[in-house]
């Protein structure tokens, strides 16, 4: 997965810089993720006529036409205004989902599965789900507050019934920086992924770093930075996040 992520990062820059490749072809590769004029035309028409229309009419149009771009889409899925979809054929959404205004769902990658959103999920305004040849899985009834971001270079999974407050960042990847003789952009990226158990609560402004696993029923206090594993039922706070008590008995 590390090699795949490095390859994808470098590939995007190289593809966009090719003199032999038209700007339109580069755009289609980056945004649509599939070749073919019909697929590009369909994407452009749906986004042009549906994405920024406000009010009930916009909700209706997007609920009808956005699913035509997606890998799969359940019933009663509502897309707010200016929701942006990239590589939409790799986005799968369950039933009764709300994606608020100005969200970005970016499933790009060569051989990844992309973004899977379970039923009953709420994604708050201005939030971002971003893949770089990785996968993002939001299990049923996950609630993500506004201005939050989930990034994945391998796999980030958030368990069912988890509550994520505003301005949180799940950083499912990192830059390689081992070779001081090379520029950082030449060294690519690496990712170990993030796993979050069911029924967790993340306070506002939490940052979860790559390679961490957070157990079920855990609570992470506002502003914490999670750098290592968190046990089931743990209440953790601070920078870096440290365990302060067990929810089951109140003991450290």
Model segments located where?
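Acidic, glycine-centered active-site loop in nucleotide-sugar glycosyltransferases
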Residues: 231-232, 237-240
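Short hydrophobic beta-strand segments in globular cytosolic domains
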Residues: 203, 209, 221, 226-227
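Short acidic/histidine- and often glycine-rich active-site loop of Leloir-type glycosyltransferases
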Residues: 179, 228-229
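Residues that flank catalytic or metal-binding motifs in active/ligand-binding sites
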Residues: 166, 222, 232
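Terminal amphipathic alpha-helical/low-complexity segments used for targeting or macromolecular assembly
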Residues: 1-76, 161, 167-168, 173-180, ...
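Flexible, glycine/small-residue-enriched loop-and-beta-strand segment within the central core
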Residues: 84-93, 98-212, 239, 247-252
